[in-house]
Amino acid sequence: MAGWSCLVTGAGGFVGQRIIKMLVQEKELQEVRALDKVFRPETKEEFSKLQTKTKVTVLEGDILDAQCLRRACQGISVVIHTAAVIDVTGVIPRQTILDVNLKGTQNLLEACVQASVPAFIFCSSVDVAGPNSYKKIVLNGHEEQNHESTWSDPYPYSKKMAEKAVLAANGSMLKNGGTLNTCALRPMYIYGERSPFIFNAIIRALKNKGILCVTGKFSIANPVYVENVAWAHILAARGLRDPKKSTSIQGQFYYISDDTPHQSYDDLNYTLSKEWGLRPNASWSLPLPLLYWLAFLLETVSFLLRPVYRYRPLFNRHLITLSNSTFTFSYKKAQRDLGYEPLVNWEEAKQKTSEWIGTIVEQHREILDTKCQ
């Protein structure tokens, strides 16, 4: 494969940064363009240290700015699109999520057509498949099964519609007469160092005398380590550029998991943090059906108050379902088509994440000490 270049959107994010760091190791890669709305100074510094034989160009711009996207895509061989707004709690306005996740993806696809970019990889989410009910069990699901989210909540809806747009764009004619080839990856819940979700869970625990909050004690999920997710994107980029592999990948979606044990979200948080003295919440909690209907009542109150007051419930039905379902998927199709095998095993992933959590605990030790006095 001749020299090539790659644009990564959301490059300052949890997954995007890992993809950038892996990409610069790719053979024949001449340039990586890292695009995000804003980069933290420390991220820019880390990227500057990656400057080897591969040029790393940092671009700050809005996914909703069509001209910015067109400039970013000029001369690019592959786009890896990870930029997204993730919110399942109702903090971020619905329209903002739809604009970034759906319209932003549509803008980027159009920029690829105009700039004649032949390959597009979308970082989707398992949320596009559900779960739709905590009562329905999905164990080791796969792509041939018809799993599709029916939620109207902005995050799963926007990601679902964006993925549909990406896969529908496969085969589109480019401005230079070539063809756009696309695929989508659906990672499970992603954990690892710098996970914003784990970071928030640890900070909440430190403010609660070291007791981890109950978020999903009834769930059975198969979390995936961030480095393995990034690796799957690298393999997809290789595959779409390889004429021998590309035909089986074009227009396809893939569940991305690894060998992390199936467990509840609460068990995962505890397993990763127990070495640092954090412990699970042993207090009694409401039965799941009652929690679900309470969420419905809170959503109803929020809807009725909307004309005069913006009330955000502490939890909603989608969050309750997401956090308390049995919902796991196999990576066999990615293994078959992309040659995907997890780079990092569970023990190593657990150790790396736990060590990172340890640094958070030490940095914020005064919170725990104050709360325990």
Swiss-Prot record:
Metal-binding found in the keyword field: no
Coiled-coil residue spans: none
Highest taxon of source: Eukaryota
Alphabetized GO MF terms: 3-beta-hydroxy-Delta5-steroid dehydrogenase (NAD+) activity; 3-beta-hydroxysteroid 3-dehydrogenase (NADP+) activity; 5-alpha-androstane-3-beta,17-beta-diol dehydrogenase (NADP+) activity; steroid Delta-isomerase activity
Active site: 159 (proton donor)
Primary localization class, coarse: endoplasmic reticulum
Membrane topology: Single-pass membrane protein
Annotated localization: Endoplasmic reticulum membrane; Mitochondrion membrane
Listed EC numbers: 1.1.1.145, 1.1.1.270, 1.1.1.210, 5.3.3.1
Bilayer-crossing regions: 288-308
Pathway: Steroid hormone biosynthesis; Steroid metabolism
Residues where NADP(+) binds: 10-15, 155, 159
BP-aspect Gene Ontology terms: androgen biosynthetic process
Keywords, sorted A to Z: Endoplasmic reticulum, Isomerase, Lipid metabolism, Membrane, Mitochondrion, Multifunctional enzyme, NAD, NADP, Oxidoreductase, Steroid metabolism, Steroidogenesis, Transmembrane, Transmembrane helix
GO cellular component terms listed in the entry, alphabetical order: endoplasmic reticulum; endoplasmic reticulum membrane; mitochondrial membrane; mitochondrion
Catalytic activity: a 3beta-hydroxy-Delta(5)-steroid + NAD(+) = a 3-oxo-Delta(5)-steroid + NADH + H(+); pregnenolone + NAD(+) = pregn-5-ene-3,20-dione + NADH + H(+); 3beta-hydroxyandrost-5-en-17-one + NAD(+) = androst-5-ene-3,17-dione + NADH + H(+); androst-5-en-3beta,17beta-diol + NAD(+) = 17beta-hydroxy-androst-5-en-3-one + NADH + H(+)
Tissue and organ expression note: Steroidogenic tissues (includes testes, ovaries and adrenal glands).
Function, as annotated: A bifunctional enzyme responsible for the oxidation and isomerization of 3beta-hydroxy-Delta(5)-steroid precursors to 3-oxo-Delta(4)-steroids, an essential step in steroid hormone biosynthesis. Specifically catalyzes the conversion of pregnenolone to progesterone, 17alpha-hydroxypregnenolone to 17alpha-hydroxyprogesterone, dehydroepiandrosterone (DHEA) to 4-androstenedione, and androstenediol to testosterone. Additionally, catalyzes the interconversion between 3beta-hydroxy and 3-oxo-5alpha-androstane steroids controlling the bioavalability of the active forms.
Family from the record: Belongs to the 3-beta-HSD family.
Protein name listed in UniProt: 3 beta-hydroxysteroid dehydrogenase/Delta 5-->4-isomerase type 1
Organism per entry: Mus musculus
